[in-house]
């Protein structure tokens, strides 16, 4: 799905292998807060290796004696990885259950603490990653490329995981927009997200191709750093250009839905021209009830560091909620993901 999308730093020449083993992809979830210690929800921090999020949630539900719907999470995480994440269990008026019964070589309970609010999808600050890429080839320019990514970021593309194996989530969305009924709410949400993500990626790629990844268009919608607050100005002012250059604001692209574009003027015209061939997709998203939203055009990994030794690269960084680690790797090298006989299940936070 991402083969035709533009690269911010040009197509990479280095090659490597991602996830040769689970320990090569480490994800530590950061909620951005500590559970308060009281309330009717139990937050459980779990370390899992080679297990998917939904399956572990089912084990927790059985151990706690509750319905599966009573167990929630902030985000799905890659299966073939070592991940630490939080689960929430709704247990009003009940004592804490013995969750140690689910522990095994691949599952460890790290922390259990009560909280007064439900753990919801997206209810997190972000994720810390430690990636080990092996079998490096043609890596002569890798050091300078790493530096460029640390300084300028990468396209904030939605990763392959969003679209399903072979793009099957998009095929399902297309069928749904053509009238096929999808009764499963989770599947319906998955297919809508895939369609919306494809349109976002198309606009980001088009801006990069036109040399507009770091350049303001009149009417661009920008987002304040560290928040989801957005605004647009009719013209390109020196003040706004300086704020963009300093990182105080970020360029954005639309996540399609009902309502008017938050951009205006030349920027809105550009976005509409890119999406003109996707009229049926836009119409389908609007009829499904999704509202317009914005997402940063670029993604700058935080606290990025690396160690390059021979044919192995160890790369660590932090990404905010909604960002994909694989989008960072894509800009860095042509990484072949080891096939372990199952589809990786991951959310936007773990690239997963």
From Swiss-Prot:
Organism listed in the record: Aeromonas hydrophila subsp. hydrophila (strain ATCC 7966 / DSM 30187 / BCRC 13018 / CCUG 14551 / JCM 1027 / KCTC 2358 / NCIMB 9240 / NCTC 8049)
Entries under PANTHER family matching the protein: TRNA PSEUDOURIDINE SYNTHASE D
Entry superkingdom: Bacteria
Positions of the catalytic residues: 78
Pfam families, per database record: TruD
Keywords: Isomerase, tRNA processing
Ranges where the TRUD domain occurs: 153-299
Coiled-coil annotated residue ranges, if any: none
Family from the record: Belongs to the pseudouridine synthase TruD family.
GO biological process: tRNA pseudouridine synthesis
Record bears the keyword GTP-binding: no
Cellular component terms (Gene Ontology): cytosol
MF terms (GO), sorted A to Z: RNA binding; tRNA pseudouridine(13) synthase activity
Keyword Transmembrane: no
CDD domains the UniProt entry points to: PseudoU_synth_EcTruD
Protein name: tRNA pseudouridine synthase D
EC number, UniProt record: 5.4.99.27
Top class in the EC scheme: isomerase
Functional description taken from the UniProt entry: Responsible for synthesis of pseudouridine from uracil-13 in transfer RNAs.
Reactions listed under catalytic activity: uridine(13) in tRNA = pseudouridine(13) in tRNA
Record InterPro entries: PsdUridine_synth_cat_dom_sf, PsdUridine_synth_TruD, PsdUridine_synth_TruD_CS, PsdUridine_synth_TruD_insert, TruD_catalytic, TruD_insert_sf, TruD_pseudoU_synthase
């Amino acid at each position: 799905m991402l083969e035709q999308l533009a690269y911010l730093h040009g197509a990479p020449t280095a090659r490597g292998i991602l996830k040769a083993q689970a320990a090569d992809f480490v994800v530590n979830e950061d909620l951005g807060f500590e559970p308060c210690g009281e309330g009717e929800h139990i937050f459980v921090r779990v370390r899992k290796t080679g297990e998917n999020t939904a399956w572990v949630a089912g084990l927790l539900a059985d151990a706690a004696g509750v319905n599966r719907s009573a167990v929630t999470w902030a985000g799905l995480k890659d299966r073939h990885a070592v991940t630490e994440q939080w689960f929430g269990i709704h247990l009003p008026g009940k004592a804490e259950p013995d969750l140690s019964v689910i522990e095994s070589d691949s599952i460890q309970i790290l922390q259990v603490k009560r909280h007064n609010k439900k753990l919801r999808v997206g209810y997190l600050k972000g994720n810390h990653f430690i990636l080990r890429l092996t079998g490096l080839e043609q890596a002569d320019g890798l050091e300078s490329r790493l530096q460029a990514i640390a300084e300028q970021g990468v396209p904030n593309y939605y990763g392959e995981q969003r679209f399903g194996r072979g793009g099957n989530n998009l095929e399902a969305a297309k069928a749904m927009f053509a009238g096929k009924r999808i009764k499963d709410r989770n599947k319906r949400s998955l297919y809508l997200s895939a369609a919306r993500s494809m349109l976002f990626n198309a606009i980001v790629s088009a801006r990069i191709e036109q040399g507009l990844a770091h350049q303001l268009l009149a009417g661009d919608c920008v987002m304040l750093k560290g928040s989801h607050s957005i605004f647009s100005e009719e013209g390109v002012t020196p003040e706004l250009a300086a704020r963009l250059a300093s990182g105080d604001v970020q360029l954005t692209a639309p996540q399609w839905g009902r309502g008017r574009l938050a951009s205006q003027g030349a920027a809105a015209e550009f976005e509409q021209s890119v999406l003109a061939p996707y009229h049926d997709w836009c119409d389908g998203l609007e009829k499904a009830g999704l509202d317009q939203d914005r997402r940063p055009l670029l993604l700058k990994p935080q606290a990025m560091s690396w160690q390059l030794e021979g044919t192995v690269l160890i790369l660590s960084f932090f990404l905010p909620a909604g960002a994909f680690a694989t989008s960072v790797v894509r800009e860095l090298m042509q990484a072949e993901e080891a096939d372990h006989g199952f589809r990786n299940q991951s959310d936007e936070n773990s690239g997963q």
